[in-house]
């Protein structure tokens, strides 16, 4: 049966669990995890050992096929899968801004799913939903750090970097359909300028029922192996002149020159699989000092924070008799 635990006992078990997690990287492959495209050539041997036999250069340029078929919803990765702007993404990526706004008590798309049998039936996403297509990425470290030195105080350094970033972004954003971002890599070691096209008319094409599409994360039944239809389809539209426009009835599908081709062959056990996308972050290249801080202070501070939350909950949930 299930073990009955108090919040404090649960906290103690979580401590042990966190310690166990800290030891896992020692057991994992040294080349697992997330890598930037330009790093692929340095992994040529490892990729071949893993079963990738094509030219590594073909997955090293984010602006050539197949890399340039990968797009972002701003909070999720996605990919063009047709020349008419059809995009595949995860089910949980369309729940809030595509399914929810188009659902009602009488027409619950979470319960029954949705399929547009023609482009005319595709459903408008919530206002502000966009697809982001990366057009350019370049190193701007020297420009961002201009005016700083090793002696610059932290606050002053932050202000200089912030002002330099704003100036670079203003110069980069030449139209309403272009958005530019300054990204920091390796804890400020390098900076890159990303120039992206914003597609502002996005519509829901297909989503399975929630009981099919939800990927997990629930309290019960969160274990492997499991089978989940965690995917959905949306389509990007533009104005008749081909430029990015907000939703309008006469908008036309975006022409995607690069798109992934879906194989009907499926996969076999031990087939090579690579996931391309826009992950939030990785800590695989933290410095020794950063790891040392985590071990000496960071993790303990987090445990202390969790314990304070447990104490607060217990204080406000005890019965009058203290139980």
Task: Indicate residue ranges for each PLM-predicted region.
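Short, positively charged low-complexity motifs
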Residues: 1-2
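Compositionally biased regions
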Residues: 5-7, 30
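Short, intrinsically disordered, charge-balanced linker/junction segments flanking boundaries
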Residues: 8-11, 24, 318-323
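Positively charged n-region of N-terminal signal peptides that target proteins for export
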Residues: 11-17
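Sec-dependent N-terminal signal peptides
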Residues: 17-26
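Terminal presequence/propeptide segments associated with secretion/organelle targeting
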Residues: 28-323
